[in-house]
Structure formats: structure tokens, C-alpha cells
Design a protein with these regions (language model features):
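Cytosolic nucleotide-binding catalytic cores of signal-transduction proteins
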Residues: 1-82
Length: 82
């Protein structure tokens, strides 16, 4: 997940080698698992809804390609083609 997620981001947004799961990765890992509601993500990670919204927006703005398609691309990570 981490490598495929990083491939969607510009280099400055990518976690450095050896860095543990940062907040952005945790948020988008939950989104990949199907938890897309910011309120639920905020409760799970113990952040405010505003903080989750800000992280999601910041990452989408720094993504490679169309920002409106970013979360759709995250949902495709690790998906098995049939």
C-alpha cells in the first residue's frame, strides 16, 4: 500500500525512507479500507473532523494527476484485476 500510495504523490509529500505510517498514510489507508466519512476517521484516529478534512485536502492538492480522481486512485491500490 505504502509504495503504491507514494506513487500517487509528488516527491515532497512522500514519506521519507524508514518513516512510520504518518497521519496522511493512516487516513488514506482507512479510506482504502472503505471508511470514507471524515467524522468516522476523526473518531478512529482521535483527531478533529477539521484536521482530517485539512489533511485530505492537502494531500489531494499535492497529488500527481487530477486531484478530483485521487481518492478513486487510492481505492484502486492493491485491487486484484479479474
Amino acid at each position: 500500500f505504502v509504495e503504491e500510495f507514494n506513487a500517487l504523490l509528488t516527491e515532497p509529500m512522500q514519506p521519507k525512507p524508514g518513516e512510520l505510517l504518518n497521519t496522511e498514510l493512516r487516513i488514506f489507508a482507512l479510506i482504502r479500507l472503505g471508511i470514507t466519512d471524515s467524522t468516522k476517521i476523526a473518531q478512529f484516529l482521535r483527531y478533529s473532523v477539521t484536521t482530517i478534512y485539512n489533511y485530505r485536502t492537502r494531500v489531494r492538492n499535492k497529488a500527481l494527476g487530477e486531484r478530483d480522481e485521487f481518492e478513486t486512485k487510492v481505492m484502486q491500490i492493491g485491487k486484484v484485476e479479474e
